[in-house]
Regions:
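Active-site capping/gating segments
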Residues: 120-163
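Conserved beta-strand signature within the Rossmann-like core of class I S-adenosyl-L-methionine
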Residues: 107-120
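A short glycine-rich, Lys/Arg-flanked "PGG" loop and its adjoining helix->strand segment in the class I
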Residues: 96-110
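Conserved SAM/SAH cofactor-binding pocket of Class I
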Residues: 4-86, 96
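Conserved hydrophobic residues forming the short capping helix/wall of the S-adenosyl-L-methionine
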Residues: 58-59, 103, 125, 129
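Short glycine-rich, flexible loops that bind phosphorylated cofactors or substrates
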Residues: 92-94
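Conserved beta-strand segments of alpha/beta enzyme cores
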Residues: 41, 66-68, 112, 133-136
């Protein structure tokens, strides 16, 4: 499951960080990460209540106490976090614009956006105006060929847009 590929890049510390999953849908990548990181708090944010209900039901069924759901649009959300994860919820430029306020005050190492995306991202990254670091998921472990064009896109909290 490529949701867990994010674990290769997120910190492995006993410290309790807060991770916001923007456009969480049914809880991916946050639910698998919440299992792996019980010391972290996960804020699942989505504008569609039905999706949040599914994600919360899954979390409740498997006994996760480090997951909370938030029915809101991310751009008007008043929560704070150390990391943002997303699974192709929106174009990178919009994700950056809509989420930077969530990271205010974070002192976590490599605080920023970690987004799972696929395909050729060169145009999307160029249009976003942010400096993005791409990590090919296929290089992190022995993933099947399906993951050859799957990426983790990292944008640091402090990045300044060029456009």
């Amino acid at each position: 499951m490529h949701s867990l590929a994010l674990a290769w890049l997120l910190p492995h510390e006993p410290t309790s960080y807060t991770i916001a999953d923007v456009g969480c849908g049914g809880g991916f990548p946050s639910i698998p990460l919440a299992i792996l990181y019980p010391q972290y708090q996960f804020l699942l944010i989505d504008s569609i209540a039905k999706k949040l209900h599914v994600a919360q039901s899954i979390a409740d069924e498997i006994g996760l106490t480090n997951v909370s759901t938030h029915h809101t649009r991310v751009e008007s959300c008043d929560l704070r976090c150390d990391y943002i994860v997303s699974r192709a919820a929106m174009p990178l430029g919009r994700l950056y614009d809509y989420t930077q306020h969530l990271l205010q005050g974070s002192r976590a190492p490599r605080s920023g956006i970690y987004c799972l995306k696929g395909g050729d991202l060169s145009e999307e990254i160029a249009q976003s105006g942010v400096t993005a670091q791409l990590t090919a998921i296929s290089t992190l472990a022995n993933y099947p060929d399906y993951y050859q064009d799957k990426w983790i896109v990292y944008v640091a909290k402090q990045d300044k847009r060029t456009n």
